[in-house]
């Protein structure tokens, strides 16, 4: 089993450098595969870095800080970290300048950002679900700094999980067993028995509540981006986590198991890159007659306007627009 850093490029990448006198046809085919993959990955990462960088800038300097935007800001930082570290690894594979320290830190922070994104998306889903089920509590009794405290705790949890995964499994040429297996039992429990079920269940409740309460109106934009972001994460980012757990937990040395890792990593970078696009597209909906700037679109999608309505002398809160 090879370290993760050496498997984040198609298998042809390492085969070519190890063969000193490869056949010309084979050499050409391997290099085409290698540089095509790296080029596409770098383009995706570059676009994602620009998009998340703009999103971070707008959220810090241009958009009023709200509970939900705090989560989105931290999620953008996590996505930016994943994209930056993935770019570094691809550049190392391109120029064959293998610095073990640089690559080790790049892999560490990439996994760190990935885990943080998973944790933050779960927190976002759960909180918005609570805001639908208990609107009065959310608007009146929610702790003022709950988002900041939650993000801090989730970053700390990601430090613990990522540190254990990297120390015992990912950065080792021969992962330390049974320690590595215990680490991935812990990671697997957190991921598939805690965070993913909470994420899916919260979004299912959110979807049902939005559809039932807003008929025949369209769903609130805020909830659309939450559900879209979660679906994209489950489709594009989760497969890499599943492969890592299967590979390291089973101590697999089968090359076929790791052959798909580079492409799953590419899907993960697509997930990190597409989130700002989702925010802008959803924020621009229903604006057919006027063009809205990026700032205006983001302000529209992140705004939360509790509307007070009276029915039988009771105060009810409508969903944010």
Swiss-Prot record:
Any GO molecular function: angiotensin receptor activity
Key word Cell cycle present: no
Subcellular location field: Cell membrane
Annotated glycan sites: 23
Intervals, Cytoplasmic compartment: 57-71, 127-147, 210-225, 272-320
Aminoacyl-tRNA synthetase found in the keyword field: no
Intervals, Extracellular compartment: 1-35, 93-102, 169-188, 247
Record field: transmembrane: 36-56, 72-92, 103-126, 148-168, 189-209, 226-246, 248-271
Protein keywords: Cell membrane, G-protein coupled receptor, Glycoprotein, Membrane, Receptor, Transducer, Transmembrane, Transmembrane helix
Gene Ontology terms describing biological process: G protein-coupled receptor signaling pathway
UniProt topology in membrane: Multi-pass membrane protein
Span of the signal peptide: none
GO CC term, one of those recorded: plasma membrane
A matching Pfam family: 7tm_1
Taxonomy, superkingdom: Eukaryota
InterPro entries on file: GPCR_Rhodpsn (IPR000276), GPCR_Rhodpsn_7TM (IPR017452), MRGPCRFAMILY (IPR026234), MRGPCRH (IPR026221)
Free-text function comment from the UniProt entry: Orphan receptor. May regulate nociceptor function and/or development, including the sensation or modulation of pain.
Family, as annotated: Belongs to the G-protein coupled receptor 1 family. Mas subfamily.
Protein name in UniProt: Mas-related G-protein coupled receptor member H
Gene: Mrgprh
């Amino acid at each position: 089993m090879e370290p993760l850093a050496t498997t984040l490029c198609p298998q042809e990448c390492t085969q070519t450098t190890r063969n000193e006198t490869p056949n010309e046809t084979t050499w050409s085919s391997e290099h085409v595969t290698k540089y095509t993959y790296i080029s596409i990955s770098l383009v995706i990462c570059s676009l994602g870095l620009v998009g998340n960088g703009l999103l971070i800038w707008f959220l810090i300097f241009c958009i009023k800080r709200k509970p939900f935007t705090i989560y989105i800001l931290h999620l953008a930082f996590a996505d930016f970290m994943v994209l930056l570290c993935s770019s570094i690894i691809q550049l190392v594979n391109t120029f064959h300048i293998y610095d073990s320290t640089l690559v080790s830190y790049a892999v560490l922070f990439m996994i760190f950002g990935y885990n943080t994104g998973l944790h933050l998306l779960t927190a976002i889903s759960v909180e918005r679900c609570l805001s639908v089920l208990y609107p009065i509590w959310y608007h009146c009794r929610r702790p003022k700094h709950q988002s900041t405290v939650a993000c801090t705790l989730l970053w700390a949890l990601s430090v613990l999980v990522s540190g254990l995964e990297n120390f015992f499994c990912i950065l080792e040429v021969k992962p330390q067993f049974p320690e590595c297996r215990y680490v991935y039992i812990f990671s697997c429990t957190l991921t598939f028995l805690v965070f993913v079920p909470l994420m899916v269940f919260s979004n299912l409740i959110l979807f049902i509540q939005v559809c039932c309460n807003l008929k025949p109106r369209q769903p609130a934009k805020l909830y659309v981006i939450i559900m879209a972001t979660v679906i994209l994460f489950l489709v594009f980012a989760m497969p890499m986590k599943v492969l890592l757990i299967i590979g390291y937990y089973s101590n697999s040395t089968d090359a076929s198991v790791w052959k798909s890792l580079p492409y799953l990593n590419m899907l993960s970078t697509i997930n990190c890159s597409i989130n700002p696009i989702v925010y802008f597209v959803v924020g621009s909906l229903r604006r057919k007659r006027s063009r809205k700037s990026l700032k205006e679109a983001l302000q529209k999608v992140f705004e939360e306007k509790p509307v007070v309505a009276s029915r039988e002398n009771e105060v009810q809160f409508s969903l944010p627009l």
